[in-house]
Design a protein with these regions (language model features):
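A low-complexity, Ser/Thr/Gly/Pro-enriched, surface-exposed linker/loop concept
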Residues: 17-25, 40-84, 122-124
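Extended Gly/Ser/Thr-rich low-complexity repeat segments
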Residues: 38-45, 58-68, 93-107, 116
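Catalytic and substrate-binding clefts that recognize carbohydrates or anionic sugar/phosphate headgroups
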Residues: 78-245, 251-254, 258-270, 471
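Glycine-centered tight beta-turn/hairpin loop motif at sheet-sheet or coil-to-beta transitions
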Residues: 30-34, 87-89
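Bacterial Sec-dependent N-terminal signal peptides
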Residues: 1-19
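N-terminal small/glycine-rich loop or linker at the start of catalytic domains
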Residues: 239-251, 373-384
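Catalytic domains of carbohydrate-active enzymes, especially glycoside hydrolases
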Residues: 263-283
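Aromatic- and carboxylate-enriched substrate-binding clefts and catalytic-loop regions
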Residues: 277-515
């Protein structure tokens, strides 16, 4: 009676166990849970496993994954309750009754197994949509060491024995992926806020919203090089960065005029200290209401001090009556050319949020592509844009062309989590074209960097791209994205923690990182 009631709630009935072989794996009905389960081989070393209530697979977009399933030679062995599928790299055994899956190497050594009946769906409302809280539980060896989960600030290398809330924010990059000393990797493909938990009883991912459980198991020859090679195949290759980006950089918070920036460059050259890159930080656009205008509108940069048309843009806190000397560098383009003439490169700060005076703000508001959240700078009226909206990404690039056309060399994509203060649950009900902000949250930096990379690449392939960003997600390496560890404080114990943070981050398959 209980089973009948549950199946009616799910909208379908189960009369008998059904396991069907497919071209890429199998489809299985788990009677006791009323779930459909699919095992899909993308390659001999990458297998995807999904499960969902009912018989019809929900539509789902994967932001990191770019690989389509390849034709894979599978050797099936049916031993009653257990169906085995073997490739040239691994063996996957499925319990047809319970749906439990176990992964083995070709010598029969157990790599990882799911927990029996370890998939849970709890109905919830996600904004206007019906959805579920989705969790999946696994069993690891007692003393097994795992790495990954992005860039955490706890100083730990081994990620066992803890609970982590995977939610992107300043200094914390959350990637629902771990890799084992046994030579496999596991990516949980859900960009909503997710809790990772590891106890002596189980290891689990529990996501705030989703229509299916969805993960990728990766195993190639038992090495981390093999796993990372598979990640690049699954999510995209990492482009070669410009050689100069591997050199010495100079940055401060912040240069307040073109002269100040160029004077610092001059001093490096006088001292004979090699310098490859120098950074123009925030407020070159002016005051907070004009935040991220992507134009030099600060009167100190455009030789317009005293001009009423431009003085309204003078940054908050700067004295409009101060006796500033006549600038030697009189325009932003002259500054960029000066940097290049002295054999250096210029990176400039750009943000996902826009102040209410900017043209971007007005255009994005017209298409409902501004997130209704409190962001940096506070009390300015600035709002982050919606990078899941293709039109919004086009608007973003249209204005970034102002800086691109000046021959600026690299982009500092700051605060790409994005900053979100005084968070309320209703903030996450905002509807993007792909669903609620809650359902896509952690993929925000991936999509924001994607928009810049792809729009610039469509314009020209003559110059290597370089994007330094404050946040990241699985697969972001394909957008020439270089993450740094955010606004950490300058203390020795904090610096020590960055070593583990960077190593765990790069073990997620993203090679470039700094602090």
């Amino acid at each position: 009676m209980l089973l009948t009631v549950f199946c009616c709630i799910c909208g379908w009935s189960i009369n008998a166990q059904e396991t069907t072989r497919t071209a890429q794996g199998l489809k299985n009905i788990i009677q006791e849970q009323g779930l459909s389960q699919e095992v899909i081989f993308y390659s001999p070393d990458i297998v995807r496993v999904i499960a969902y209530p009912g018989q019809t697979r929900p539509e789902k977009k994967s932001y990191p994954v770019v690989l389509s399933p390849e034709e894979v030679k599978l050797d099936y062995t049916d031993n009653g309750d257990i169906l085995s599928m073997k490739t040239s790299c691994m063996e996957v055994r499925v319990n047809k009754q319970t749906g439990k899956i176990a992964y083995y190497d070709l010598n029969g050594n157990l790599l990882l197994q799911e927990k029996e009946f370890g998939i849970n769906f709890i109905p919830r409302q996600d904004g206007p949509n019906k959805s579920y809280r989705v969790s999946q539980r696994f069993l690891l060896d007692t003393d097994e060491i795992i790495y990954g989960l992005g860039q955490q600030q706890d100083g730990r290398m081994n990620q066992r024995g803890q609970e982590l809330y995977l939610f992107n924010e300043n200094t914390k990059v959350s990637i629902p992926y771990f890799t084992s000393e046994k030579g496999y990797g596991l990516y949980w493909d859900n960009p909503s806020p997710t809790t990772f938990s590891d106890t002596p009883m189980e290891t689990s991912f529990n996501s705030e919203t989703g229509l299916m459980s969805d993960y990728y198991f990766i195993y190639r020859n038992g090495t981390q090089d093999g796993v990372i090679g598979c990640i690049r195949k699954l999510t995209g290759a990492s482009p070669m960065l410009p050689l100069w980006t591997m050199g010495f950089w100079q940055c401060r918070e912040r240069y307040k005029s073109s002269d100040e920036l160029c004077d610092v460059l001059d001093r490096y050259r006088e001292l004979g200290i090699p310098l490859d890159g120098i950074v123009q930080d925030w407020q070159y656009w002016g005051c907070d209401s004009n935040w991220n205008a992507m134009k030099f509108m600060n009167p100190r940069y455009i030789n317009a001090m005293g001009d009423e048309k431009w003085m309204r843009y003078l940054p908050n806190g700067e004295d409009p009556n101060a006796n500033y000397p006549e600038p030697r560098i009189k325009s932003p383009k002259e500054m960029v050319d000066y940097v290049h003439k002295h054999n250096a490169h210029l990176m400039i700060s750009i943000w996902p949020s826009f102040g209410p005076w900017t043209d971007q703000y007005k255009e994005l508001k017209e298409i409902n592509a501004l997130l209704p959240v409190i962001t940096w700078p506070r009390n300015s009226g600035a709002q982050p844009y919606d990078p899941f909206n293709p039109k919004a990404r086009e608007i973003y690039w249209k204005y970034l062309r102002n800086l691109y056309d000046m021959d600026i060399d690299a982009w500092w994509t700051d605060a790409t989590e994005p900053d979100h203060f005084d968070r309320k649950d209703k903030d996450f009900d905002f509807m993007t074209p792909d669903g609620t902000f809650r359902s896509v949250h952690n993929a925000y930096p991936l999509m924001s960097n994607k928009g810049i990379y792809e729009q610039q690449r469509a314009l020209s392939d003559s110059k290597r791209l370089f994007l330094m960003t404050r946040s990241s997600y699985f697969g972001q390496q394909r957008f020439a994205s270089f993450c740094w560890s955010g606004d950490v404080v300058s203390q020795w114990h904090v610096m020590r923690k960055q070593i583990a943070a960077g190593l765990n981050y790069t073990l997620c398959g993203i090679p470039y990182w700094n602090t």
